């Protein structure tokens, strides 16, 4: 289908296709390909509102919920608001959801930690034994880690209850860190039949937004759960693997899905102008062949590629590019400076953002601390929320 020969409501059938997967008598799992600007969240909300209208009373009586996992608190809050905070929908970030699953199982968490700490210590001790200089920084750091992990292992007997804050830094002796919560949840889902029963009983439908960025080990666990419980459980993934931001997500998520999964596709991009969509399609042409369509009422727009040496002075280069774009587009807003500047810049990486925005001295020390690293990268570090 060409960029011109289509209607703006070409994806209208997708909502029905997704809704049909949530059949409680014959559940079906699915991966919804939804590229940039496709209206993914709108489809999610429309489908859930229709489900609520038809099955909400039944779910409330049976104390069941649909779990909707998002990547950020902002996305979670938006979906909750659009679903009118209805109790049959459990909307949370992946860390909050994982913690809800594992929190009651204190002894099982202890067993996992004992085993995991032992493996870590053995690995560190092996590396330490092969160190040529026990006084260099790497050796000193390893020695500190070995001591810390041994202390933690011994302290496990004194812990009555573990604590965890999905939006905090979790540094107390009885706390779990973000990575551990995800790994423990994945392990329990894959290996413990009781956990599998609890998940599908409470959440017979589990939907994951931005699934391409959900940690690989947890996605693999959900795949295993769906394989075992597919007669009573529907797993729905929303996403676009080309929009993957974090490297710990599952690569090529849409490849190798079971034959009995539904694979609906949203073709429209309601957000971008036509030239931009043409460029997007060209970029991904040899990757997965997915093509998006623009709205018929969108302008052509402009898409220009400037290739510069990494040795150039960035501020001068960007100023030059803005002036060039002002001439190309006949739009003076490109060339404005200071408070009148009206150009949006996409910064792809945390270190780059820190350098450009002038907070390197704040970012670097926190990034170097392993226990704070995850929080500073995903915005959950409690102290950073002050800013």
Predicted regions and their residues:
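The feature marks helicase ATPase cores and/or their adjacent C-terminal helical subdomains
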Residues: 1-387
């Amino acid at each position: 289908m060409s960029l011109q020969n289509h209607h703006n409501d070409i994806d209208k059938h997708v909502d029905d296709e997704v809704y049909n997967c949530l059949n409680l008598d014959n559940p079906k799992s699915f991966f919804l390909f939804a590229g940039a600007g496709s209206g993914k969240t709108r489809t999610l909300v429309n489908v859930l509102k229709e489900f609520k209208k038809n099955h909400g009373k039944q779910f409330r009586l049976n104390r069941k919920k649909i779990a909707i996992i998002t990547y950020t608190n902002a996305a979670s809050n938006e979906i909750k608001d659009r679903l009118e905070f209805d109790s049959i929908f459990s909307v949370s970030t992946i860390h909050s959801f994982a913690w809800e699953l594992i929190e009651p199982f204190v002894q099982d968490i202890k067993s996992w930690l004992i085993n995991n700490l032992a493996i870590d210590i053995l690995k560190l001790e092996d590396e330490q034994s092969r160190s040529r200089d026990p006084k260099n920084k790497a050796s000193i750091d390893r020695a500190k880690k070995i001591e810390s992990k041994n202390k933690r292992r011994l302290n496990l007997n004194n812990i009555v209850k573990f604590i965890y804050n999905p939006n905090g830094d979790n540094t107390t002796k009885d706390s779990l860190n973000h990575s551990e919560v995800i790994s423990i949840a994945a392990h329990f889902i894959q290996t413990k039949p009781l956990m599998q029963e609890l998940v599908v009983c409470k959440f017979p439908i589990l939907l994951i937004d931005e699934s391409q960025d959900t940690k690989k080990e947890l996605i693999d666990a959900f795949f295993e759960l769906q394989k075992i419980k597919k007669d009573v459980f529907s797993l729905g993934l929303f996403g676009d693997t080309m929009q993957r931001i974090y490297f710990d997500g599952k690569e090529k998520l849409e490849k190798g899905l079971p034959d009995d999964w539904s694979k609906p596709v949203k073709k429209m991009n309601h957000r971008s102008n036509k030239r931009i969509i043409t460029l997007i399609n060209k970029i991904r042409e040899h990757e997965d062949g997915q093509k998006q369509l623009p709205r018929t009422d969108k302008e052509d727009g402009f898409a220009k590629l400037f290739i510069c040496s990494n040795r150039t002075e960035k501020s001068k280069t960007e100023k030059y590019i803005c002036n060039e774009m002002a001439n190309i587009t006949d739009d003076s807003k490109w060339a404005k400076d200071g408070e009148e500047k009206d150009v949006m810049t996409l910064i792809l990486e945390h270190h780059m953002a820190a350098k450009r925005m002038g907070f390197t001295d704040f970012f670097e020390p926190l990034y170097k601390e392993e226990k704070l690293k995850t929080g500073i990268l995903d915005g959950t570090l409690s102290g950073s929320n002050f800013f």
